[in-house]
Amino acid sequence: MALLEIIHYPSKILRTISKEVVSFDSKLHQQLDDMHETMIASEGIGLAAIQVGLPLRMLIINLPQEDGVQHKEDCLEIINPKWIETKGSIMYREGCLSVPGFYEEVERFEKVKIEYQNRFAEVKILEASELLAVAIQHEIDHLNGVLFVDKLSILKRKKFEKELKELQKKQKHK
């Protein structure tokens, strides 16, 4: 397994619309394993393939258990997701490995139902609510070139742009 480089905003790569996965082979399995290792090392709960430069419609989500541990066997590998149903509305404070250090409230659906394939091309149905539903929406947005900061109000977006400029200045002076 290998750690992959996470692409950061404002890279144009993050605006790429990802392509459907058609080969469910050992290369795909390795990419998923590398994504998981990268996500855990970066202390994330979700990662879309485009965030590591792979323009493929696949993502992983691994929510921590009550003990705070993210067990590999609990990792959801979601490939070629399709929306079946969405319900309700919830505000959730989100962050993103591609937008490090910035967190903001975003409105999402409270419940979602998707169809997807696993690493073996088996079709699955998943119903989710709360944090898992939010994470699924956040990661599927990445597959469509959308970032959570795109969903902010004008005021919150200006705050984000200001904080980003300040962060970039600090990094230049290091």
From Swiss-Prot:
It is an enzyme of class 3 (hydrolase). The active site is at E139. Its EC number is 3.5.1.88. The keyword Manganese does not apply. Keywords: Hydrolase, Iron, Metal-binding, Protein biosynthesis. Its cofactor is Fe(2+). It comes from the Bacteria. It catalyses: N-terminal N-formyl-L-methionyl-[peptide] + H2O = N-terminal L-methionyl-[peptide] + formate. Fe cation binds at C96, H138, H142. Signal peptide: none annotated. CDD domains: Pep_deformylase. Removes the formyl group from the N-terminal Met of newly synthesized proteins. Requires at least a dipeptide for an efficient rate of reaction. N-terminal L-methionine is a prerequisite for activity but the enzyme has broad specificity at other positions. This is Peptide deformylase. It comes from Helicobacter pylori (strain J99 / ATCC 700824).
